[in-house]
Amino acid sequence: MAVSRAFQRPATPFGPGHRGVDLLGSPAGPVLAAAAGTVSFAGPVAGRGVVTIGHGAVRTTYEPLQPAVTAGAVVRAGDLLGWLSAGHPGCPTTTCLHWGLLRGVEYLDPLDSFRRITPRLLALRRG
């Protein structure tokens, strides 16, 4: 996974920024769910395919893609959401996936979910 454009938190709720990360991809490549949840939206927004998944207190968005899921579908981490489409503005190559993460109305960096993973050692059982 290569990041084409990083998250840039807006200084104000409607100010400029980049409310997600852009990940380089291949045309028609599979787009998979990052975590389990329920699809709350799958369809076009401003001419591009979008899928939104609710995960309890947060929701993730994926665009542009040709959705393979419909609203109400329950997905697990790794399930197919659709196929990557061209047409994301600002992408330096043919196709990029814009991946967003929201908690309420606050945009978060979706990559922080991976950066915060702390290794844990488990006790060795002798028996």
Language-model features: where?
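Zn2+-dependent peptidoglycan hydrolase active-site motif and core
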Residues: 34-68, 98
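Conserved beta-strand positions that form and line the central face of beta-propeller blades
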Residues: 22, 52, 61, 83, ...
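Short, well-structured beta-strand-loop connectors
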Residues: 30-39, 69-86
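Acidic, glycine-rich catalytic/binding loops that coordinate metals and/or anionic ligands
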Residues: 2, 24, 70-77, 95-127
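Solvent-exposed coil/turn segments that connect beta secondary-structure elements
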Residues: 8, 28, 44, 56-58, ...
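Short hydrophobic beta/alpha edge segments that flank linear recognition/processing sites
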Residues: 50-53, 75-92, 97-98
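Short glycine/threonine/proline-enriched tight-turn/helix- or strand-capping micro-motif at secondary-structure
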Residues: 2-33
